[in-house]
Amino acid sequence: MSGISELSGVTILYGSETGNAQDYALFLAKRLKYFGLKPSVVSLDHYPLKNLVTDTKYLIVICSTTGQGELPRNSKKFMKFILKKKLPTDLLNHIELTTFGIGDSSYPKFNYAIKKIHARLLQLGCSELCTRCEADEQTPEGVDGYYSEWETNLLEALKSKIHGIPLTYDETVLLPADNPVEVSSNESDVPTSNSPTELSLTRMGDGSTNLLLGSVKANKRITKEGHFQDVRHLIIEGENLSYIPGDTLALYPSNDNESVETLIQSQPHWIPIADKPLLIHGEIPFVEGGLIDKSKLTLRSLITHHLDIISIPRRSFFMTLAHFSDSTTEDGEREQEKLREFSKIEESEELYNYANRPRRSILETILEFQQNLTIPVEYILDLFPIIKPRLFSIASRPSPNSVELIVAVVVYKTILRRVRRGLCTKWIKSLQDNDRIVFSIHKSNLKFELPTTKYPPILMVSPGTGVAPMKSLIEHITSLGIQQHLYLFYGCRNKENDYLFGDLWASLKSQNKLSIYPCFSRDQDSKIKYVQHKIYEQHELVGDLILNQNAIVFICGSSGAMPREVRITLVEILMKFGKMKDTEADDYLMDMENGGRYLQETW
């Protein structure tokens, strides 16, 4: 492996569900480039695995942990490959490795993903470049505090290994674009016009993805008119669909025309070229769901379908944007310094207060600094993040011809008193009957399978739209005529306003197919406010189901307080009903997790 270049032999791989790990990877890559290195940076699943053997000398893996110790979706293929038993134990003995994990210590399997990856890579022969770091989102210093120390150690290790790395770097130097974009000078390349909807469908030409084409059958509000939350029951028709309860459906949203036009107008030099064809040089960034037809790619269509201009700007965004502020004026120099400040790890509080706390968008950031900003088209793929697909739990029993979703439309006011609308849910709300859409179906991490002989009870816990996979499971089991006891603990605000599918639950209850335990947190006459309280109210039933009847527990909903409180409540019930100590009860739940009897899907 002596032929591997020291400078280009650095590979940064990331596994990221929400974008945090990806941004740390991009930030680190830019830092290393300033030191003269030429790192590759890509998700774990999209790195050509043969390159680990041929092109990699120093391997850096940054990965978050999701759910119950799961790897992010874009790292599962990589893990499956490196776990192959036939791989020789000296396969990667030419590689020096370090890893950085992002996790939440309130979850039982804290940083489980990076531990598994790190351990397996060492088994395949990697040696350690510097010590693995496991960042904890729950600590006061947050992930940034861990990252700063780990990056310092990493840079020191690389400087000691690679000859000629400078001790410092000049952050004012603009590095060449990784994915340069230019406007085609060939007038014959001008694309024919397409409506945004029809243009989105050209993704279907990408044979590397499992895309499906469907049409909207219904898009109905199912919360009461006047209730603050608009929840949609979206029904999509398709062909040859294959899914089971627990699977998710990915949608590929687009930016609205008004936001796209606002961004273009903020950069006057973009206006005359907005609808001219683009040429992308070098490797095209990976776009999950496929790039729209490249022959129809213009600046406007690229922004509309692929550039995420509504998300909160991350550190790597500011690191690049600062270069495009005109520092020849006093205002411009001051603004450039402010943008650079937001890109520094040690100024994470400033970044949080400017971007995260008020949930300021990329578009708003550009508008705020636009007087002194001139963004070259060449750098747009280096500057803007790519729109990620949005995943929703499927809410219908398996059908080859249709699939249902329950979607809460995201609308809220920030501390700046500005109205925010979620990119995807705003798009979903606009969908009309018979609109054609592209989607894909993803298999569940839960590994939920119905037994073939004995059917243990299933205890389901879900507030709000978390009831989607429960509805899928309940309808599936009842349609098969299986005699299986189903218990649903469901929480919402009001019985009259947002008790989703209340009529369905009542009908199934009357047929003795479902035991339903609803609670309504905002109803005046409701003594039981939240699902964990309702569960404890039924502690004898729940204790008997878990300890005597081997019930499966299935929890779905928002991450954070709810799953933690439900787990604490179950520990209390096991202590009371099963006469256990707290450590014994906690171990019992852990055994249930490992045995597939305690399933949790949160976001």
UniProtKB/Swiss-Prot annotation:
The reply to whether Mitochondrion figures as a keyword in the UniProt entry is: yes
Keyword set, alphabetical order: Cytoplasm, FAD, Flavoprotein, FMN, Mitochondrion, NADP, Oxidoreductase
Primary localization class, coarse: cytoplasm
Q: Which reaction does it catalyse?
A: 2 oxidized [2Fe-2S]-[protein] + NADPH = 2 reduced [2Fe-2S]-[protein] + NADP(+) + H(+)
Q: Where does FAD bind?
A: R359, R390, L391, F392, S393, G422, L423, C424, T425, W603
Q: What is its EC number?
A: 1.18.1.-
One molecular function GO term is:
NADPH-hemoprotein reductase activity
User: Which residues are noted in the entry as FMN-binding?
Assistant: 16-21, 64-67, 102-111, 137
Localisation: Cytoplasm; Mitochondrion
Q: Which residues bind NADP(+)?
A: T465, S521, R522
All copies of domain FAD-binding FR-type, residue ranges: 209-451
The Gene Ontology biological process annotation of the record reads:
cellular response to oxidative stress; iron-sulfur cluster assembly; nitric oxide biosynthetic process; positive regulation of nitric oxide biosynthetic process
The cofactors named for this UniProt entry are:
FAD; FMN
The GO cellular component terms are: cytosolic [4Fe-4S] assembly targeting complex; mitochondrion
One Pfam family this sequence matches: FAD_binding_1
Q: Which residues are in the Flavodoxin-like domain? A: 10-155
Self-association or partners: how does it assemble? Answer: Interacts with DRE2; as part of the cytosolic iron-sulfur (Fe-S) protein assembly (CIA) machinery.
Assigned protein family: Belongs to the NADPH-dependent diflavin oxidoreductase NDOR1 family.
What function does the entry list?
Answer: NADPH-dependent reductase which is a central component of the cytosolic iron-sulfur (Fe-S) protein assembly (CIA) machinery. Transfers electrons from NADPH via its FAD and FMN prosthetic groups to the [2Fe-2S] cluster of DRE2, another key component of the CIA machinery. In turn, this reduced cluster provides electrons for assembly of cytosolic iron-sulfur cluster proteins. Positively controls H(2)O(2)-induced cell death.
Q: What is this protein called?
A: NADPH-dependent diflavin oxidoreductase 1
What is the protein's species of origin?
Debaryomyces hansenii (strain ATCC 36239 / CBS 767 / BCRC 21394 / JCM 1990 / NBRC 0083 / IGC 2968) (Yeast)
Q: What is the lineage of its organism?
A: Eukaryota, Fungi, Dikarya, Ascomycota, Saccharomycotina
